[in-house]
């Protein structure tokens, strides 16, 4: 293969990268928990798979767990720095949780964010909505709406999540939205019959990419699709590549007991294909330099 052809091939391949968005219930994440070596090591490897990750059930009162986790993540993954965006502490009682976004800041940036105004107090932990830029001509921005429902009010909260979608899509004048998180949308918390009556199931345009039969739990004794990702918007759906729960115990060769020290949930992930022309542009100066260096070999003097 000639050098120019090879370089062009590399550029095109480089421009066809997937963009992975994840959600993970980290099960009562505290400073004491992340300070444990195996927990930290596993969390960092899970986070490093994702371009954007929404951590749920962060209950650290010290305010030190996330900065420590971010520092270790950036030490582990040298491909580009991660940044974080955290919600306020959310909850009705003294028990509160925080949603935390981890994102690769050289690939995406937070354009705007807010906590949904839950005037009727439907949500135990109201969604922390964020709009992110994407390296895509087809879909230059995307709205994420994470939710961790309470098992006692799953149906009520998920029906209210449809209202959140309507408000968010009007706020940003965009139908390209991803709803994601630990919905508790299966087994004893929500039967299949009740699930199928949700407005997020009956209204057109919502694509549940984590299937009802998927297992998002670590314990061998359970098989429940608690954690979900729901896509909306034609542009968003057109870029869909894959979606699945990530079986981290098998991948990282952990026993069930070791895995449960991390969480009793699997992360859920969706990959979008962002193979757009402007993804290639940052390489252009490098390519020109390489071509100039190779030019004597390509065009020898006569």
Curated annotation (Swiss-Prot):
Uppermost EC category: hydrolase
Signal sequence, renumbered to the chain: 1-18
Keywords (A to Z) from UniProt: Disulfide bond, Endonuclease, Endoplasmic reticulum, Glycoprotein, Hydrolase, Nuclease, Signal
InterPro entries linked to this entry: Deoxyribonuclease-1_AS, DNase_I, DNASE_I_2, Endo/exonu/phosph_ase_sf, Endo/exonuclease/phosphatase
Known glycosylation sites: 261
One Pfam family recorded for the sequence: Exo_endo_phos
A GO biological-process term: DNA catabolic process
Protein name: Deoxyribonuclease-1-like 1
Name of the encoding gene: DNASE1L1
């Amino acid at each position: 293969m000639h050098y120019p052809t090879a370089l062009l091939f590399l550029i095109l391949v480089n421009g066809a990268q997937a963009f992975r968005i994840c959600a993970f219930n980290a099960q009562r994440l505290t400073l004491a928990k992340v300070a444990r070596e195996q927990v930290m090591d596993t969390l960092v490897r899970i986070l490093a798979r994702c371009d954007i990750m929404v951590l749920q059930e962060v209950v650290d009162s010290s305010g030190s767990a996330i900065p420590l986790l971010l520092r270790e993540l950036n030490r582990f993954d040298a491909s580009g720095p991660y940044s974080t965006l955290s919600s306020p502490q959310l909850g009705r009682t003294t028990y509160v949780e925080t949603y935390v976004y981890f994102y690769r800041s050289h690939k995406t940036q937070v354009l705007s964010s807010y906590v949904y105004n839950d005037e009727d107090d439907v949500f135990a932990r109201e969604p922390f909505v964020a709009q992110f830029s994407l390296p895509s001509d087809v879909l230059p921005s995307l709205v994420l709406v994470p939710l961790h429902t309470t098992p006692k009010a799953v149906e009520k909260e998920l029906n209210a999540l449809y209202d959140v979608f309507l408000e968010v899509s009007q706020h940003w004048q965009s139908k390209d939205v991803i709803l994601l998180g630990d919905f508790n949308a299966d087994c004893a918390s929500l039967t299949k019959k009740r699930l199928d009556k949700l407005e997020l199931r009956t209204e057109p345009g919502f694509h549940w990419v984590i299937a009802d039969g998927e297992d998002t739990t670590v314990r061998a004794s359970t098989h429940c699709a608690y954690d979900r990702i729901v896509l909306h918007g034609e542009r968003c759906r057109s870029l869909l590549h894959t979606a699945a729960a990530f079986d981290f115990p098998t991948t990282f060769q952990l026993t069930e007991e070791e895995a449960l020290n991390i969480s009793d949930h699997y992360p859920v992930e969706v990959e979008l294909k962002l193979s757009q022309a402007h993804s290639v542009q940052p390489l252009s100066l490098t390519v020109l330099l390489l071509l100039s260096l190779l030019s004597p070999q390509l065009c020898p003097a006569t």
